[in-house]
Regions:
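Internal catalytic or translocation cores that form aromatic/hydrophobic pockets or channels
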Residues: 22
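Residues that cap or initiate secondary-structure elements
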Residues: 13, 29, 53-54
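Residues in well-ordered beta-strands of folded domains
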Residues: 8, 26, 48
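Short, mixed-charge low-complexity intrinsically disordered segments
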Residues: 39-74
Length: 74
């Protein structure tokens, strides 16, 4: 099992939100800092960490590190 650190931006399209390119980081701090830097460029952004076991297909509950703007529930 490993822990991944993800930043997911969201952009406004018509009346909804479209997920942008997912960014992955080595540490939770790096992910949170990048999300904070990108926050003013997107309708919403979230940074989170999650434990994953790709071989077994198990994914843990996301732990939000930073959230700003309009973000759908994880």
């Amino acid at each position: 099992m490993e822990t991944i650190h993800i930043v997911q931006p969201f952009d406004r399209v018509n009346k909804g939100l479209k997920p942008g390119q997912v960014l992955q980081f080595k540490t939770a701090d790096e992910a949170a800092r990048r999300a904070e830097l990108l926050a003013d460029k997107h309708a919403g952004i979230v940074a989170y960490s999650m434990d994953v076991d790709e071989e077994g297909g198990d994914y843990g509950t996301p732990r939000v590190l930073f959230e700003s703007g309009d973000v759908p529930e994880l």
